[in-house]
Amino acid sequence: GKILGIFPEGGITSTILTEAKPGAVFIASKANTKILPVSISGGEYAWDNMLKGNSSIITINIGKSFGPLEIKGSKEEKMNKLESYSRELMCRIAALLPDNKHGDFTGDKTIKKYRKEDGFRFFK
């Protein structure tokens, strides 16, 4: 009944999305719980702005939860499922961000599907 926040990329700060490590998906599958995709943008400049005495605009978007995830089978099947679910997680996060922030997931067709599910629309 508690909440655990994990940065699936491994805690790095980047202006665009990078590949996820399998830890977030692995923990969620072992806990038999759902994953709630969340995007945070604008934070990459927060410290520099704060040190200069300026404020930052940080945007947090929350998508629809998915799971629980079942990861069973041989070692190879489990690794494939971890990789697949990790990619799904990152595409769901990408759906919450403007297109220029998709990074490693640019052009993935599932982003549009997840964006529609979440009801998000970004303007240029």
Residues covered by each model-derived region:
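Non-catalytic C-terminal accessory region of glycerolipid acyltransferases
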Residues: 1-124
